[in-house]
């Protein structure tokens, strides 16, 4: 009984904490989404009922059913997100082909675009409440927004730290407040609740026909942030997120949207900001402050999610290695990526300056999230067919969801002409970077495979004791493109310097988020006094090689003593020289770009957190 009570308390505690992280983006959508939708058609009962019906069933079908019921089943050992889904498919399909890489890279690129747009539109829409307070304050909206964004990105380097504990209480107050404000309007015009009937959504399309598609781009804004429910699965778990959604977030959002619908039907004059119109004049300053705090929290969650997924991509070698700063001693997942933070800050502030209002930004917003949701639907559909063995009849569920999301995509297509091309361009540029990096590494792997054939004789000579050795031990760190240390063996062959004991360490990032300690180490004896050790990591884990080696030496038997402070680490630094010829899968500009990226990538000594005084770097030149 006590254990059950404790478990329920822990679940409620996690659900409460999830309010401050998971639901921030989707929870602040009422600030701009409804106002964006109603500008397309005249305000009358049938139009508002149709719009509210579309909003209601979008949140039910896409967010509640698709994500919380179906997609949640496709977790990768409790982890969610694009990379986790790709990992599940790779576990089942050993050689999935280039299509999975393509989808994964596009998905990551879209997340970068979302990381710029979400803080811009969220915070700008909150600060625009100043105009509702007084039209004279309109001139301060942009400067205040830019100041908030500056400090938001500035504080990333120190982490959220202690202030993070206040995120959930603020968001709970936010949801309660918007729910109450909406409810107060509904009781004055309860007829809006008829919009729950899907007849009004269908009737809306029958009346407006093809022109109704344009409104879907606006309706889709109510779901932006829905993908975060799955992406943050690893932090809070399924039960906590489902409880937080169905008990707090969803009811509050529906009350707020229906409340805005009730209000505009009672006040049919031109309403620029229907959300802030819900608030009484005496409460408006408090509402603006609360909205600003909520959007800052929502933006923080998106920025942290971008850091997290790009850290995973860096470990999986999908992007160049990035400098990773751990901002908390207690939360291992709390990281800061300086370069990414700068790119996001520059992009976000530029968007605010260019578009100037949340209404203009809304024209650019949504298409990236829409594409991300489509990718998720396709990947989970493949998992359902290949991993869950769903029959064709069940797979029709995904076909239905795909048709709905494609309809939303059709509604978002006109946004390409009014700013929607920006997130698509960001995603494309991200894809070019990642694909060029992938092609360059494939070329390096090809070159190392040739070296492996050349250096096989060294192992034979070591086995036959034909090579003289000097006392001591060398610990050689193998790069991802070098499966068994062929480049370092090549160096040894040229240098003729062989330690009495040599250990080659290869880091392998698996398609799972975490690797149990008992499965982490793999020892292979290559020759007398020459060992190859594989250390397996999950794609969400933090790499600290010296600490991992300490644990390894306790668990893996080696027939010689290890003196930690006398360990010498050998790493490779790669230099790429251009040949001027186009090679397979790489244009000349790609080779130059890859050379630039590999020169500026974080070196092994930093990435693996090796001791500077005990590390020797070996330079290797490759011709492309």
Swiss-Prot record:
One of its GO terms (molecular function) is potassium ion transmembrane transporter activity. GO terms for cellular component: plasma membrane. It is a multi-pass membrane protein. The chain crosses the membrane at residues 14-34, 51-71, 97-117, 133-153, 163-183, 211-231, 245-265, 283-303, 335-355, 364-384, 393-413, 416-436. It is found in: Cell inner membrane. Its main location: membrane. It catalyses: K(+)(in) + H(+)(in) = K(+)(out) + H(+)(out). Keywords: Cell inner membrane, Cell membrane, Ion transport, Membrane, Potassium, Potassium transport, Symport, Transmembrane, Transmembrane helix, Transport. The keyword Transmembrane applies. Transport of potassium into the cell. Likely operates as a K(+):H(+) symporter. Belongs to the HAK/KUP transporter (TC 2.A.72) family. HAMAP family: Kup. This is Probable potassium transport system protein Kup 2. The gene is kup2.
């Amino acid at each position: 009984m006590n254990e059950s009570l404790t478990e329920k308390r822990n679940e409620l505690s996690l659900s409460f904490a999830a309010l401050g992280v998971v639901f921030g983006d989707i929870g602040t959508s009422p600030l701009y989404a409804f106002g964006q939708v109603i500008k397309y058609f005249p305000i009358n009962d049938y139009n508002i009922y149709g719009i509210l019906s579309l909003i209601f069933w979008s949140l039910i079908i896409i967010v509640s059913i698709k994500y919380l019921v179906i997609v949640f089943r496709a977790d990768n050992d409790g982890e969610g997100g694009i990379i986790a889904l790709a990992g599940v498919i790779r576990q089942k399909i050993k050689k999935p082909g280039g299509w999975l890489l393509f989808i994964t890279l596009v998905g990551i690129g879209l997340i970068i675009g979302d990381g710029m747009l979400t803080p811009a539109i969220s915070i700008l829409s909150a600060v625009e409440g100043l105009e509702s307070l007084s039209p004279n304050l309109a001139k301060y909206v942009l400067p205040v927004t830019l100041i908030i964004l500056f400090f938001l990105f500035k504080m990333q380097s120190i982490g959220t730290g202690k202030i993070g504990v206040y995120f959930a209480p603020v968001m709970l107050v936010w949801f309660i407040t918007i729910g109450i404000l909406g409810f107060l309007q509904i009781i004055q015009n309860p007829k809006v609740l008829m919009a729950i009937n899907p007849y009004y959504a269908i009737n809306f399309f029958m009346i407006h026909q093809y022109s109704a598609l344009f409104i879907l781009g606006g309706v889709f804004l109510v779901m932006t942030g829905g993908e975060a429910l799955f992406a943050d699965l690893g932090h809070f778990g399924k039960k906590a997120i489902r409880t937080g959604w169905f008990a707090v977030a969803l009811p509050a959002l529906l009350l707020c949207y229906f409340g805005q619908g009730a209000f505009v039907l009672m006040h049919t004059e031109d309403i620029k900001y229907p959300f802030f119109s819900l608030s009484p004049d005496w409460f408006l300053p408090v509402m603006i402050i609360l909205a600003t705090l909520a959007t800052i929290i929502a933006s923080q969650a998106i920025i942290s999610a971008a850091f997290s997924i790009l850290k995973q991509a860096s470990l999986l070698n999908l992007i160049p290695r990035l400098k990773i700063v751990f901002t908390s001693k207690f939360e291992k997942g709390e990281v800061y990526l300086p370069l990414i933070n700068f790119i996001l800050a520059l992009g976000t502030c530029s968007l605010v300056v260019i578009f100037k209002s949340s209404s203009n930004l809304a024209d650019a917003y949504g298409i990236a999230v829409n594409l991300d949701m489509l990718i998720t639907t396709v990947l989970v559909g493949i998992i359902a067919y290949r991993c869950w063995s769903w029959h064709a009849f069940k797979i029709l569920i995904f076909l239905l969801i795909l048709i709905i999301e494609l309809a939303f995509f059709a509604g978002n297509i006109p946004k390409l002409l009014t700013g929607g091309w920006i997130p698509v361009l960001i995603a494309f540029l991200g894809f070019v970077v990642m694909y060029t990096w992938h092609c360059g590494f494939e070329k390096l792997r090809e070159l190392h495979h040739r070296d492996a054939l050349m250096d096989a004789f060294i192992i034979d000579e070591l086995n036959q004791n034909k090579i003289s050795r000097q006392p001591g031990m060398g610990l050689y760190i193998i790069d991802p493109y070098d499966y068994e240390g062929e480049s370092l063996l090549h160096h040894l062959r040229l240098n003729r310097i062989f330690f009495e004991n040599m250990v080659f360490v290869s880091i392998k990032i698996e398609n799972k988020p975490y690797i149990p300690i008992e499965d982490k180490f793999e020892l292979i004896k290559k020759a007398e006094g020459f060992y190859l050790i594989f250390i397996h990591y999950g794609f969400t884990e933090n790499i600290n090689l010296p600490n991992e080696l300490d644990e390894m030496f306790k668990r893996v038997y080696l027939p010689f003593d290890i003196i930690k402070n006398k360990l010498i680490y050998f790493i490779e630094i790669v230099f790429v020289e251009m040949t001027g010829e186009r090679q397979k899968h790489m244009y000349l500009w790609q080779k130059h770009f890859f050379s630039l990226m590999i020169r500026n990538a974080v070196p092994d000594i930093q990435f693996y957190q090796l001791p500077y005084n005990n590390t020797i770097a070996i330079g290797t030149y490759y011709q492309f």
